[in-house]
Amino acid sequence: LLSNPNDIPGMITHVLPIHDRTCLPPLTREEFMSDTELIARLFPTEGIHACEEVGKVRLPVDMNKIASLHEVTLRMEHVKIRYGSRTILKDLDWEIKNGEKWALFGPNGAGKSTLLSLVYADNPQSYANTLYLFDRKRGSGESIWDIKKRIGYVSPEMHLYYKENVPTLNIVGSGFFDSIGLFRKCNAEQETVALEWMKVFGIEHLKDRLFLTLSSGEQRLALLARAFVKDPDLIILDEPLHGLDVSNKKKAAAIIEQFCDRPGKTLIYVTHYPHE
């Protein structure tokens, strides 16, 4: 099942269109791709979540947040990651200055997730490498929580980490504590901010719905809201639009762009699609 005609793999020869829970007549790949009217009907670009509404939304701002004065958000020097006899990363140098926006491309298995795990303090081999985050060398006394509190993160795998069926508002609020699940209760101010971000992504009506009952697209929007609640200095988005329909892809992309236009916001964006 695909939500974007451009995602159809090259080896596919036939397509079964589905519209309004009804299977339409099957088509060859060529017939389907040439039927612009059908594609427009299956993948509408307008609707209640259309991106033009985003400009009218005021993104929440943490008025108590002190602007970060760091110069370099990330610097890696000759990084090497190895598991057994397999080398994942070798002699990698990478520097991201405060406020820069980076796109990270590469096929599955190229080492993107490993690279991100170093940045997000989830890889123990980071201590065996020369790595700086926010002008501070890893292993110089900071905890992983000191690092995570300045980073917003979402990835396709995050869906798999949530096994407890809790209200969606709890999932969004867990972003304040960098936990999988809500082990600490949000205060009133944090809950208000979480609800504001849910409203930005158009899912405030889902706040009391159990997370595991949501569609995959609704879950993705909730996890995106979770990534933004802290007003992070660094936002890491690993295929953030995966699983969204066309209109919500546009909406989410516009929100990301609007957030990253703020001074001092650094972005690492992982995607398979250059147009994103």
Regions found by a protein language model. Give the residues of each.
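Conserved ABC ATPase signature
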Residues: 186, 210-214, 218
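ABC ATPase NBD Q-loop/coupling interface
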Residues: 130-146
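Hydrophobic anchor residue at the start of the ABC signature
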Residues: 224-225
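Conserved beta-strand-loop-alpha-helix hinge in the C-terminal portion
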Residues: 21-52
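Conserved structural motif at the start of ABC-family nucleotide-binding domains
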Residues: 74, 88-91
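Catalytic Walker B motif of ABC-type/P-loop ATPase nucleotide-binding domains
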Residues: 235-239
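Conserved ABC ATPase "signature" region
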Residues: 173, 188-206
